[in-house]
Amino acid sequence: NKDFEKVNGLCLRDKENIYKFTNPRALISDLDTVPYPAYHLLETDIYFEHSAYSYSVESFNSKRRASTCWERGCPRGCTFCSHNGMSRIDLQNIYGDGDRKKGEKLVRIVDKENETFQMPARWPTPEYAINNVKLLKDELDVDFISIVDENMTSNLKWTKEFCRLYVEEGLDKEIKWGTLGDAPSVAVKPEIVKTMKDAGCTYISFGFESASDKVLNQDIQKGQIRAHLQKTVDTMLANDMTPLTTFMMGNPHENIDDLMETLDFWIKNKASIDPFICTPYVGSPLFYDNQDFVLQQYDERLKLVFEGKAHVDKEIVAKWKLSALDKFMTDCGDAFQYTATVSQYFTIPELFALKNFMYKHDARRLLQMAHQRFEQTK
C-alpha cells in the first residue's frame, strides 16, 4: 500500500496519465553484497552452442564460454556512449527536465546521503570476482570467460590483485579470459598487459574510435590521443597479442582530412578495419547536442519549423518530436539498422561510400572525393 511516488528511482504515470520521475535512488555502495546470478535458472546450453568468439584462438575454440560484468559506471565521458544513459549525466537530464544544472542540484541531495554518485566507476573486491569465476566453473563448467568490463586496464591496483589471485587459484590454467581496455592506461602503464596475459588473458579490445587528434579531442572526448593508440598497438605486439581495435566515422566535425589521418594509421600498422558509423544513441551527449538535427531526419516537418519556414503550435511540434523520437529509438533497437547522421560534412550515402573506401584502404578514392568537394566550393 506504499505510495509509489515516495519510492526513489522510479518512472511512473500519475492520475492524469502523465509520466514523472521520483527522486534519484542511491547506488549500492558495497558491490560485494550483490548476489551472483542464478545460473541454474538459465538455459545456458542454448548460449554455449554459440560460444566461438573470434577475438583469440582460445575464445574461438571455446565450447562453454560465459560473459560476466563486475564494473559499474565508467571513468570516461565519451560523447557517443549510450552508457551515459545509465549515469549521472542522464540523471541530471531527467531530474532537471533537460536542464542539467538544475538536475545536478537534485542529484547532489543523494550525494550527501550516499557517496556512490560521486564515483564515476565502481568495482566489487577482486575476491568477489574470483569467487564468481569459481562459481561459473563449478556450476556451468565454463572453459572461457569474456569479462565485459570496459576498464580493466584503468584500475591497475584492482586488476593486478585480480590477476594475482587468478594465478594463485590455478584458474589461469583452466579458464582463459578476455576483456576490454583503454589506450591511455596502457600507454602510461604498459606492464599491465603482461600481467594480464600471464594470468590467462588472451585478448584485450580497445575503442580507438579515430586516429585524428582533432576528432579525438573535439568529438570523442575520451581523453586519448593518437600517440596513446600507437603506444598501445606497440605494447600489444610486444606481448605477442593481437591489437583488437574499433573505430567509428561520421563524427560531427570529422572531414576527409581526418579520415585520411585514420587511414594513414591503419596502413602504417597493417590493420584491416571495417569502421562503425557514428550513432547518436539517446542518453549520450552526442544525442543531446544534436537532438533537433536527429529528429528532423525522422520528420521533415520539424526541419521546416526549425528553419522558420512553418509556424506550428508548440503542442503539435512537441507531438511530432515524440513521434520522431519513437521512430528513431525503434531503429536503434537493431544494431544493423542505420539510423541518423550527426556529420556536418557528409550525407548518409556518402558515409557508406567512405566506409567502403576506408575498409579497402582506398586512399585514392578518398582524395578523389576531397578534390571533388574542393572543385564544388570554387
Regions found by a protein language model. Give the residues of each.
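C-terminal accessory regions of radical SAM enzymes
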Residues: 11-27, 48, 52-56, 65, ...
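Conserved strand-turn element in the central/C-terminal portion of the radical SAM core barrel
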Residues: 181-184, 209-222, 233-258, 276-282, ...
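Pocket-edge positions in alpha/beta enzyme catalytic cores
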Residues: 23-26, 121, 221, 251
